[in-house]
Amino acid sequence: MALSYYSLLLLLLAVWAPALTLVMAGDPDILTDYVIPANGNPMNITGDFFTFTGFRKVFNTSSAPEPNSFTVTKATMAEFPALNGQSVSYATLVFPPSTVNPPHTHPRSAELLLVVDGALSVGFIDTTNKLYTQDLAAGDMFVFPKGMVHFQFNSGNQPAMALSAFGSAAPGVVPVPVTVFGTGIDDAVLAKSFKTDVPTILKLKANLTPPNKS
């Protein structure tokens, strides 16, 4: 998916996202400039420690085939240790046509989504079970409040890309479908909860894989 010059300019706007996410941050404050990894030597810290290059593969579309399914590339504390204590992280989301980021939550942070290329339909549900939806174009932003179940969907026939900023170095993710149907909850419990029968539950579980515990 080739990014237009306009789309690349939108990425520059994303540098302001950390300022907002810091306001919403929930990570514990630190008493040092930054957190050195366990058993790390402060004398060995260089600019490389504060640099993350994992998004290059996302934007270097000329050398990599377009994915055929929804793909997320994270830059959280796990992938970018320098974020530890900084209360900020990013993720890139790539949506081929007719793909979805299924309903999920981030228990430790709000999410600020910037559509970089293409268009997305998004929404979240609040604690009163009210659904809020919006159709977004390139350049639009949408905030998903902390802990709310939300989704993003590319219903069009063109690919889409988005950048998400979080107010935590480890926002966490709880995918609703696989968490409910792929973690070993008794089938009878699920059948009664969804007012259906066990064979229907088994059909729902057949195509789901357990969530990643990393």
From Swiss-Prot:
Cited InterPro entries: Cupin_1, Germin, RmlC-like_jellyroll, RmlC_Cupin_sf
Subcellular location per the Swiss-Prot or TrEMBL entry: Secreted, Extracellular space, Apoplast
A cellular component annotation (GO) from this entry: apoplast
Family: Belongs to the germin family.
Residues that carry a glycan: 44, 60
Keyword Cytoplasm: no
Extent of the signal sequence: 1-25
Primary localization: secreted
PANTHER family in UniProt: GERMIN-LIKE PROTEIN SUBFAMILY 3 MEMBER 3
Pfam families in the record: Cupin_1
Annotated disulfide bonds: none
Name this polypeptide is given: Putative germin-like protein 9-2
Domain Cupin type-1 positions: 56-202
Quaternary assembly: Oligomer (believed to be a pentamer but probably hexamer).
Protein's organism: Oryza sativa subsp. japonica (Rice)
Function of the molecule: May play a role in plant defense. Probably has no oxalate oxidase activity even if the active site is conserved.
Keywords, in A-Z order: Apoplast, Glycoprotein, Manganese, Metal-binding, Secreted, Signal
